[in-house]
């Protein structure tokens, strides 16, 4: 019976939604410097778009400062442009091959906006998890209708899918709560 339906595959897909949320939340600016803030930055390098981390080293020497060490001197202007074009609201200050980004304090209004964005990301992740649950339950129902699994197996698998869904939603809620706390901490 386990070869007809794999709950672990559903869990993996649900985990993917939580990982995606973690990545999206990492890109939200919280007033505290973080190397992950620059993950969405794309740089026009060598004739193609590349992630910033493929042309430079990003570090956080101070709580409100991000340092970008560009490997190739000819790429400094392109990296600056990529940072400005990313709409992160950061102003690059260049010294040779090092670009410094000061992270300004967030005002109350901007903090509330960021919390709303975080909630939107979390809701999208919850919806993705629910879609995975629906796919799983539909598959189980089809297997039962085709008499490939018994009604008891269907009920047991339905419960396992629901348990996996609850765990994934709880993880998403925890990620959101942590990010909200980080954003609202002055």
Curated annotation (Swiss-Prot):
HAMAP family in UniProt: RRF
InterPro entries per UniProt: Ribosome_recyc_fac (IPR002661), Ribosome_recyc_fac_dom (IPR023584), RRF_sf (IPR036191)
Domain of life from the UniProt record: Bacteria
Family classification: Belongs to the RRF family.
Lineage: Bacteria, Pseudomonadati, Pseudomonadota, Alphaproteobacteria, Hyphomicrobiales
GO molecular function: ribosomal large subunit binding
Protein name from the UniProt record: Ribosome-recycling factor
One Pfam short name: RRF
């Amino acid at each position: 019976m386990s070869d007809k339906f794999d709950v672990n595959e559903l869990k993996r897909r649900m985990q993917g939604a939580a990982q995606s949320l973690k990545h999206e939340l990492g890109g939200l600016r919280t007033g505290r410097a973080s190397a992950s803030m620059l993950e969405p930055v794309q740089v026009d390098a060598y004739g193609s778009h590349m992630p910033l981390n493929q042309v430079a080293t990003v570090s956080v020497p101070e709580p409100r400062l991000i340092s970008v060490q560009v490997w190739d001197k000819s790429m400094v202007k392109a990296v600056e442009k990529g940072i400005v074009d990313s709409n992160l609201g950061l102003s690059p200050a260049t010294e040779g091959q090092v670009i410094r980004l000061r992270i300004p304090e967030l005002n109350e209004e901007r903090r509330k906006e960021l919390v709303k964005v975080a909630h939107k990301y979390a809701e999208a992740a919850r919806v993705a998890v629910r879609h995975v649950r629906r796919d799983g339950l539909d598959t189980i129902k089809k297997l039962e209708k085709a008499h490939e699994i018994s009604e008891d197996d269907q009920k047991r698998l339905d419960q396992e899918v629901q348990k996996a869904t609850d765990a994934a939603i709880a993880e998403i809620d925890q990620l959101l709560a942590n990010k909200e706390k980080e954003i609202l901490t002055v």
